[in-house]
Regions:
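C-terminal lobe/tail of nucleotide-utilizing enzymes
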Residues: 1-95
Length: 95
């Protein structure tokens, strides 16, 4: 859920656009909810500069959230690949 909330300097969160919409939508679509990414201008600044926030501000709320989402997706892909390792598509060379 991108722009899920605004992380305030005191560590609290402000739900600018409400709360739970992404989770509700994921549940209705029958897909996993993978996380909430807070609204942070540094995400855009870093993206424009070519330096992702996970590099420029790794301990920020957005940096931590994006890293957690990436780790969750990587774990799910790893498990899916392991479970489907017998379903290898053979590569055939055509001469």
């Amino acid at each position: 859920e991108n722009m899920s909330y605004l992380a305030l300097p005191d560590g609290t969160r402000l739900d600018v656009f409400g709360h739970g919409g992404g989770r509700t939508l994921a549940q209705a679509a029958g897909v996993p909810f993978i996380g909430e990414i807070p609204l942070d201008p540094q995400v855009r600044v870093g993206g424009d500069a070519g330096t992702p926030i996970v590099v420029s501000h790794p301990q920020s709320a957005a940096g931590l959230a994006l890293r957690a989402v990436a780790q969750d997706i990587a774990a799910k892909v790893s498990v899916a690949n392991f479970m489907n390792q017998n379903n290898v598509i053979p590569i055939t060379e055509i001469s």
